[in-house]
């Protein structure tokens, strides 16, 4: 990269995005997230693999959703909208509320009661969004907001909004720009299924323009209790500790299937136990704290290595979609509890076992 300050994904990749010179860019300087080598993760699974972690939790609101939201909000402002609406398992609501605040728009978000991590809910609230907790699932909330957007002067900013995926594809551009090539495999958690579709779109556009010579195989991971694509059926009551991917009827289901099939990839499932084990492993082996949905990718890596699905010497990129601070409760439940000690040197040394 040059010494010029990072301008946000729209300005950085303007040539690849549906914007004009008159589009009012609403940005929090999202993007430019680190691609972190993970040698200890490789050592713990298959030492011949080159593993990199695309840490999207370092975006302004702590998740990959910011990439799509800068586009969705910018285009909403361009169209004259004064309000936006979304359904969310948490991260979309946080991003929508923040970017709407940045643009001076009203934001309305609907979340399933009891299914949104505290960190995400607090973000939407502090940014001034009107938050409604629905007595139902995410899929029911999405159906409601879609109907509202069809009949009222408010812009829908879920991933069914085509500008969302346009923004999210920039993560694939960054992977190539940082790695110097496309990976052999790209592993990603799948909830509403927009992100795996967006990455594939980005890789294909770079390939079309000769910026990469090969394309990765896209591998998606769903939680076992919320795996509609894997099971090829709508899950009426999805269940998983990974609330960000607790979705039973993904809006981008068809696009995700195309991405997987066209890239010769596949979709697999991981259990909550595997997710939480990988969640702790990622934090303790690589020093990276990401939310449980992100750990689905690491759990999938472990499972697929054991199954022999990756050729030795392959390069893998794993997308970690959101920061661990999004869901502090799960972290505290999964970690070693703090120990109380008297304020004395001997008591402290007795606990440290040095």
Which positions does each model-derived feature cover?
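PLP-dependent amino-acid enzyme catalytic core
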Residues: 1-354
């Amino acid at each position: 990269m040059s010494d010029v300050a990072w301008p946000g994904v729209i300005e950085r990749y303007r040539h690849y995005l549906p914007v004009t010179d008159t589009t009012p860019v609403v940005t929090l300087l999202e993007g430019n997230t680190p691609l972190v080598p993970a040698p200890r993760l490789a050592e713990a699974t298959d030492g011949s693999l080159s593993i990199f972690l695309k840490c999207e939790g370092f975006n302004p609101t702590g998740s990959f959703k910011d990439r799509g939201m800068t586009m969705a909000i910018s285009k909403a402002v361009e169209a004259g909208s004064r309000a936006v609406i979304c359904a969310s398992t948490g991260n979309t609501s946080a991003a929508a509320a923040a970017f709407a605040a940045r643009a001076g728009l009203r934001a309305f978000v609907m979340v399933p009661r009891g299914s949104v991590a505290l960190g995400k809910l607090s973000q939407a609230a502090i940014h001034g969004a009107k938050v409604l907790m629905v007595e139902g699932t995410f899929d029911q909330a999405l159906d409601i907001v879609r109907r509202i957007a069809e009949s009222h002067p408010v812009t829908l900013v879920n991933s069914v909004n085509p500008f969302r995926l346009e923004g999210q594809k920039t993560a694939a551009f960054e992977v190539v720009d940082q790695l110097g090539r496309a990976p052999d495999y790209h592993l990603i958690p799948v909830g509403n299924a927009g992100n795996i579709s967006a990455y594939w779109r980005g890789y294909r556009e770079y390939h079309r323009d000769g910026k990469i010579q090969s394309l990765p195989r896209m591998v998606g991971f769903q939680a076992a209790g919320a795996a509609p694509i894997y099971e090829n059926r709508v899950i009426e009551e999805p269940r998983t500790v990974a609330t960000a991917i607790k979705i039973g009827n993904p809006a981008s289901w068809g696009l995700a299937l195309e991405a997987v099939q066209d890239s010769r990839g596949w979709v697999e499932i991981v259990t909550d136990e595997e997710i939480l084990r990988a969640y702790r492993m990622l934090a303790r082996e690589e020093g990276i704290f990401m939310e449980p949905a992100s750990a689905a990718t690491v759990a999938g890596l472990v499972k697929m290595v054991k199954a022999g699905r990756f050729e030795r010497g392959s390069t893998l990129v794993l997308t970690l979609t959101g920061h661990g601070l999004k869901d502090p409760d799960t972290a505290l439940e999964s970690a070693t509890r703090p120990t109380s000690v008297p304020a004395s040197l001997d008591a402290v040394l007795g606990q440290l076992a040095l």
